[in-house]
Amino acid sequence: SQWTYRQDIRNEEQLWKNFKYILEQNNKAKLNDTPLSESEFAKVKNDLSHASFYDAGKWLVGENGKVYVHVQRGNETLHLVVMNNEHIAGGTSVYEVINQYQAFKTEENDERDRRFDVTLLINGIPMIHIELKNKEHSYMDGYRQIKKYIAEGKFRGLFSNIQMFVVSNAVDTKYFSAARDTELNKKFITGWIDEKNYPVCDYMDFAKAVLKIPEAHEMVTKYTVLDNDKKKLLILRPYQIHAIKAMRNASKQGKSGFIWHTTGSGKTMTSYKATRNLLMDIPSIEKTVFLIDRKDLDMQTKMAFQSYADNDTIDVDDTDYVDTLIKRMTDGNRQMIVTTRQKMQTMISNRLKEGTKEYQIIKNLRVAFVVDECHRAVTPETKRKLEQFFNNSLWYGFTDRKSTRLNSSH
């Protein structure tokens, strides 16, 4: 499933019409094969026109991977699925490309129509917008143009759902997350690097690496974080994405390993998204535990994790007491737990009694541990004890010590 070029979608009316068609096709049974009425669709249009890209991001998180719009029909509320983020590269997902779209005239005296270069639609919704320049111009001209369009209010209606921008002059290509014009910052413009750390600058190479399916859909779902404190949309950088993919691939093979990082590399966000994605992507994992040393569990890390999780589809529990940890480990919910190595040790050494129900439940949990600053948070002896206790555990350690750099190990 790749992109279909839709030459026929050039204005707002055609864009909404296309979205309506896809929505109705994907919800035939719920709609009882009766198309949405004008008033029903007016409600949908209103719900999909967001005040900010961040608000759109909150809505696009959905419920258990599904993004809904709710329509009242008689006495019944219809919960229509707009997008299913579990159907990446298949299922109900529809991928389309439009270009030369005529953007809104914001004032009667707009001298000329603004024409957008290229936009990628998922299920009829603009999600990634691309501005292209020729080689004589800098990609920064594309950035400034997008900033101007945002300031002019061009990204509204269905276009208010954009999550990611791409700018290129064919030989230099960058991406950044959608934000208000006053919040856009040059320092968040990011180039792509491949797994071997080589820059990917050419726009066609960038498209193959980042904008094909499933990668493009994953960029705006799996690799986007909503920071509730700052009310900002954040898209991970390439090295963060490669680290998360490596963890996912290792866990599918039942392997553990280390992730090497440098100071200031966005480790908190990488570790959050990695811990979260393991839970979302690997159905066999029942709990993911972000394990940290008591000295390192500062308020900043806890607050950052909570801020990222506030708009996410999973619960993050930071456990203040060992009793709370036991309760979380035995509650049967698939969730992400943030706790300290000391509490985990106390739980298995002093609190759990062999033969009890909670002992059996916790011992047999299929759990993935993500360890922060693993070179000092968990000694080899501690890890051995924890591994001996848990029958089914995987381990991923973040470290800034190059000597421990591994791709994966048993």
Language model regions located:
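Short beta-strand-centered segment that lines the nucleotide-binding/catalytic pocket of NTP-utilizing
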Residues: 290-292
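Signature of the SF2 helicase/ATPase Hel1-core->accessory helical subdomain module
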Residues: 139, 342-356, 362-408
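Acidic/polar loop patches that form or flank catalytic/metal-binding clefts of enzymes
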Residues: 5, 312-318, 396-398
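Conserved motor-coupling elements within RecA-like helicase/translocase cores
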Residues: 322-337, 361
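Acidic, glycine-rich active-site loops and adjacent beta-strand->loop/helix elements
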Residues: 294-295, 402
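Phosphate/diphosphate-binding loops
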Residues: 151-167, 318-320, 368-371, 375-376, ...
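Conserved helicase motor
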Residues: 295, 316-326, 341-346
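ATP-dependent helicase/translocase motor core
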Residues: 2-287, 296, 300-312, 332-336, ...
